[in-house]
Regions:
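A short, exposed helix-loop element centered on a Lys and neighboring polar residues
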Residues: 53-54, 98
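C-terminal helical subdomain
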Residues: 106-117, 132-175
Length: 175
């Protein structure tokens, strides 16, 4: 991870925005969740978030500016039956974002944690959940471009009104 950030800074330029957007939304009963599955989901969702956030902070602090966005999910707020590994990783990522926001905010770094609550228009949804994809024409599925616009708005916010957490969901998604 250290080498990745150094390479980007050297070859592309200063890193202004980092988006950590990974998750393994696996569905297993708690009795069927193996230690290996639980550990891998946690490593991908929580540990990798920590490593990404730490390295982003290291390059942003000297410039006293930057934005780190950790994408959350409904599971960041509440666990659901069969999603113990995913929910615990997302809970951990949310706590990390809160801690980093408190530590890095005074140093000029905006840390945000948007909650994505709903299906996103992707090939995965089209191929595996056609019934969800059918809701697209009813604005019942999140458009990735619209999510990106909200993330950009987070980055552009003035320091006196930073948003830490917001929910993004289609109008028909219950909450």
């Amino acid at each position: 991870m250290v080498e990745l950030f150094a390479h980007i800074e050297k070859d592309i330029g200063p890193i202004e925005v980092v988006v950590f957007n990974i998750g393994a939304n696996v569905h297993f009963s708690i009795l069927d969740t193996t230690e290996r599955v639980y550990r891998k989901v946690w490593e991908m969702g929580a540990l990798a978030g920590f490593l990404t956030g730490r390295e982003a902070a290291k390059v942003m602090i000297p410039r006293k500016r930057g934005t780190i966005i950790f994408t959350g999910a409904t599971a960041s707020l509440r666990g659901s039956k069969g999603f113990s590994a995913f929910a615990s990783a997302k809970f951990a990522l949310r706590a990390l974002a809160q801690s980093m926001a408190r530590e890095l905010g005074p140093k000029g770094i905006h840390v945000a944690h948007p909650i994505i609550d709903g299906a996103i228009d992707t090939d995965f949804i089209r191929d595996n959940f056609p019934e969800r994809y059918e809701l697209k024409d009813q604005d019942g599925i999140l458009n990735p471009e619209h999510i990106a616009e909200q993330y950009w708005q987070l980055h552009c916010q003035p320091r006196d009104s930073w948003t830490h957490e917001l929910d993004l969901r289609p109008w028909m998604e219950t909450f």
